[in-house]
Amino acid sequence: MNKITKKQKMSFAGLLIAIGIVYGDIGTSPLYVMKSIVTENGGIANVNRELIVGSISLILWTVTLLTTVKYVMIALKATNHGEGGIFSLYALVRKRAKWLVIPALIGGAALLADGTLTPAVTVTTSIEGLKNMRFGDVIPVPSQEVVIMITIIILVILFSIQRMGTSVIGKAFGPIMLIWFTFLGVVGIANLSHDWSLLEAINPIHAIRILVSPANKVGILILGSVFLATTGAEALYSDVGHVSKANIIGSWPYIFVCLSLNYLGQGAWILHNVSYHAGNGDFNPFFEVVPSNLRLFAIALATIAAIIASQALITGSFTLVAEASSLKFLPRMNIIYPSTEKGQIYIPLINKMICVVTVAIVFLFRTSHHMEAAYGLAITVTMLMTTILLFEYLGKKGKPLYLRVIFLIAFAFIEGMFLISSLTKFLHGGYVTVLIAGFILVIMYVWFYGNKIRDKREAKNAYVRLDEYTEMLTDLSHCEDYPVYATNVVYMAKVKYNKFIKREMLYSILDKRPKRAKAYWFVTVNVTNEPYTAEYAVNTYGTKNVINVQLYLGFRKQTSVNVYLRQIVHELIADGTIEAQPQRFTTTPGRDVGDFSFVIVNDVISPLTKLTGYEKFMVEARVWLQNLSSNPASWFGLEYADTVVERVPLILGKHQESYIKRIKPKKQTKK
């Protein structure tokens, strides 16, 4: 049994890694949820029992319905080869309706945008716990500027260790997060023991009443703060590929109990200390419920938990981007697999981008209070889009229509209420995540629909049969009218069904300056689900100089095409599949393999293309994004090989039949 299969089973190690990777975001919500609710209602001096009981009831039932029911019980069943998240969900249902791509694009863009705010708000909140704390005669963190500096240092270090992989990080974070959740539960129950009557918050009636009660000064807008308790639910779904759903389902009950106890404990403390710190703007009930002799320990533990919360979003972002690339929502990117688990990935470009944006957000908002005002808006949009896709998934699984409609109406109503309340955050900072999400959405829209238009309008003869050109290529190899371009000309070209190839590849060989070579190689790289596969198959179509190579490489294998190809050439020469390539001038006596020239073809829009203005803009924007983001030489491990990048005209749509009219020569008269 291989590792991929084993990972699906629940184990103690798997549970520990799940606690370390998946629950960071939702596990740090107690740091700021009650603080936000109290602050929005005018501070601790203005709260009463009805507000606290109702608010905690809202929190408990929000986490129950959205996280437990929707994500743990329903969404985790909707995995695509073990991977979760909104893009994996879309991949499962996309054949049911073309329009489903819209919620997938919107939800994915919003989730990626929200991932830039989570690290900033969680780390800043935890470090603010140190602000003005005295150690003897010293105050190490006397101002918000020092908080910002420490926060940025922590974030930069966090992003720097991502290349180690989630397995290594999870093993380190798992035990710490287990301590964190246990600490939340113990502190919560210690404070709750002073007022067990607060357990009445379990009754959902209190949650409904507080929305219209005069004790709640912000009305339905309180949901904007309550929603912060469940923002990590979508990240939980996105991270399932890193730890498996069995380990998430097995660990969630303990996490849920610890979170619930902590919220109840904070509520109990607030009710018994209404006049405490009434004028302190930095008041945070999370740290106040902790005994003073444990305050420093709580802050240190909260800081580490905040770092892990950031990790949950970062790993989820890597997964989302990889899935987006495979679905042609985003350009291809360099993906690194730090472990033997295919679901555990690292994308250097995305890591750098999230790091830069997150640090910029810390500088822009400066305080956790301002960040909380912007937090959660984007994720409500993602949750709504996930609900739409889950409705279709349930239909695919044959669930009765009435159950699907109940599911859709119930969760769309709940999430719609949260969205309405979160919209008030737009002018207070929510616009930042909206702008980031909009930017990502534009890129994904252009890439996806640019590809769609290209595929739809591409000439019918865009693909040709390679075996129909073998005779012409053989003749070119022996034609002395042309100089030898290279001994081996290699095209990184996907050969479909072992015979179809894009015409532009043959155009590069034949229609431009003909490339005479001893052998023509067409190499296709296929990535397998096994980590260390290294196999190849060849088809020469009955020739000695036209070779279709299918490389099958495990996801952890380096794609060093030039290294593999030299071995393949030696083996094919040895068994007589191709002719030897003896070198007259060489520093290696007996060398029988010639030089290699790797050709990578890039598209440019041809003047012959005839598209509508919109179609032309989309295709040109898509080509521009491709040229901006891609480095094919690094994809294939050809950085140090003889690589040529050629531009080949891309002809789309109907050709213009006539450009200029021929006339008879005009007689010229002397002046």
Swiss-Prot record:
Domain of life: Bacteria
TM annotation in the entry: 12-32, 56-76, 99-119, 139-159, 172-192, 218-238, 251-271, 296-316, 345-365, 374-394, 400-420, 429-449
Compartment list: Cell membrane
GO cellular component, one term: plasma membrane
GO molecular function: potassium ion transmembrane transporter activity; symporter activity
Keywords, ordered alphabetically: Cell membrane, Ion transport, Membrane, Potassium, Potassium transport, Symport, Transmembrane, Transmembrane helix, Transport
Catalytic reaction annotation: K(+)(in) + H(+)(in) = K(+)(out) + H(+)(out)
Family in the record: Belongs to the HAK/KUP transporter (TC 2.A.72) family.
Function per UniProt: Transport of potassium into the cell. Likely operates as a K(+):H(+) symporter.
Identification of the protein by name: Probable potassium transport system protein Kup 2
